[in-house]
Curated annotation (Swiss-Prot):
Its EC number is 3.4.11.-. The lineage of its organism: Bacteria, Pseudomonadati, Pseudomonadota, Gammaproteobacteria, Pseudomonadales. Keywords: Aminopeptidase, Hydrolase, Metal-binding, Metalloprotease, Protease, Zinc. The keyword Kinase does not apply. InterPro entries: M18_aminopeptidase_2, Peptidase_M18, Peptidase_M18_dom2. It comes from Pseudomonas savastanoi pv. phaseolicola (strain 1448A / Race 6) (Pseudomonas syringae pv. phaseolicola (strain 1448A / Race 6)). This is Probable M18 family aminopeptidase 2. GO terms for biological process: proteolysis. GO terms for molecular function: aminopeptidase activity; metallopeptidase activity; zinc ion binding. It is an enzyme of class 3 (hydrolase). GO terms for cellular component: cytoplasm. Belongs to the peptidase M18 family. Zn(2+) binds at residues 82, 156, 401. The keyword Protein transport does not apply.
Length: 429
């Protein structure tokens, strides 16, 4: 099971270079399992035992399985994750021609660790909006090939490079795509038009706009002398999206189960398709006949917010509280913060720990050092919007927000096992 899950995750990561592609890949899995697509603009006819999914902005998805008994009776078991990861996004007018090279101006999306982006074989993917035959259409594209690179400055010209230096995102991050000769002018939109034709056979009249990100073409892999680790891009947080999907597809229960994977977590979640928007609340409201039933159901429900946790690094152990250093391959981590940066409380943490014990899954705890600021997740946001009890958990990870992160190769199976047990559980606290 472990090898099968890890290989499946590697394939999932390869197919999901952007939130748009991640959502499309999730859709493929759910449709293959018989889930029915719902359109928010239509009237819904939800059936007992039915399986459905809804997407918004092509970058967020809510998938759910209606239980054989009403959610008003047993509540809803929810797992939440996010589809986005820190990256470099192409600007609207990105063309740069400097010293005979064609480069693209980029914005830093989220809290990216920038140094690892240098000297990597980069490709480009995302969503393009264009006009064709008088109509506005959108399509996902993925160049797949390594078409760009951000070369480092040689140490001979930067003698203090190994002493640390501040990276200037405006000047130092534009990737190089090609050399240009003489008066030749680079045309990025023409490149996108060609890609639409090459990848999809679409003859666009004009490219109107786009949301495109660079990504590392190196595939994720199981690494280490004994295969102990899983290395790859976007483990934060596509690892949790994949685990939640596997758990939802492979668990059976009389209760209603739901997976929500939203966009824009890395930049605050404030969007129509982010956790700070109304998407999840609006969808859950449509599953229940009245506002009173909605409130009653939410109070019987529970959310597991799944997002990667900081594993204790052997070279930087002092960055962790000595008693709360999660180890790779030692199971999922319960995240706790008294200032509500995580939504965990003693009741929800206790229930998650109970699930882990029942499934013989190891479990750990994380609290940030008292002299360091704590990050956050969709957990507190969703708990606030819905009023739902929540526990924040995640798998230990090194190099979070790097272009290539590292997790334990045993932990994905641990997480899928406990999330499956959660979806199948007959009683909530």
């Amino acid at each position: 099971m472990r090898a099968e899950l890890n290989n499946g995750l590697i394939d999932f990561l390869k197919a999901s270079p952007t939130p748009f592609h991640a959502t499309a890949t999730l859709v493929q899995h759910f449709e293959a399992a018989g889930f029915q697509r719902l359109d928010e603009r239509d009237t819904w006819a939800i059936e007992t035992g039915g399986r459905y999914f809804v997407t918004r902005n092509d970058s967020s998805i809510v998938a759910f399985r209606m239980g054989r008994q009403s959610p008003l009776t047993g509540g809803i078991r929810m797992v939440g994750a996010h589809t986005d990861s820190p990256c470099l996004r192409v600007k609207p007018q990105p063309e740069l021609q400097r010293q005979g090279f064609w480069q693209l101006g980029v914005e830093v999306y989220g809290g990216a660790l920038l140094a690892p982006w240098f000297d990597r074989d980069l490709s480009l993917a995302g969503r393009v909006t264009f006009r064709r035959d008088g109509k506005v259409e959108s399509q996902l594209i993925d160049f797949k090939l390594p078409i760009a690179v951000i070369p480092n400055l040689a140490i001979h010209l930067n003698r203090t490079a190994n002493e640390g230096w501040a990276i200037n995102a405006q000047n130092e991050l534009p990737p190089i795509l090609a050399q240009v000769a003489g008066d030749e002018r680079a045309d990025f939109r023409a490149l996108l038009t060609d890609q639409l034709a090459r990848e999809h056979g679409l003859n666009a009249d004009v490219v109107l706009d786009y949301e495109l990100s660079f990504y590392d073409t190196q595939s994720a892999a199981v690494v280490g002398l004994n295969g102990d680790f899983l290395a790859g891009a976007r483990l934060d947080n596509l690892l949790s999206c994949y685990a939640g999907m596997q758990a939802l597809l492979n668990s059976e229960s009389d209760e209603t189960a739901l997976l929500v994977c939203t966009d824009h977590e890395e930049v605050g979640s404030s969007s129509t398709c982010g956790a700070d928007g109304a998407m999840l609340e609006q969808i859950v409201q449509r599953l229940l006949p009245s506002s009173e039933d909605y409130v009653r159901t939410i109070q019987k429900s529970l959310l597991i917010s799944a997002d990667n946790a900081h594993g204790i690094h052997p070279n930087y152990a002092e960055k962790h509280d000595a008693n709360h250093g999660p180890k790779l391959n030692a199971g999922p981590v319960i995240k706790v913060n008294s200032n509500q940066r995580y939504a965990t409380n003693s009741e929800t943490a206790g229930f998650f720990r109970h699930l882990c014990m029942a499934e013989e899954v190891p479990v750990q705890s994380f609290v940030v050092r008292s002299d360091m600021a704590c990050g956050s997740t969709i957990g507190p946001i969703t708990a606030s919007h819905l009023g739902i009890r929540t526990v924040d958990i995640g798998l230990p990870t090194f190099a979070m927000h790097s272009i290539r992160e590292l997790a334990g190769s045993h932990d994905l199976a641990h997480l899928v096992k406990v999330l499956s047990a959660f979806y199948a559980s007959h009683e909530l606290p």
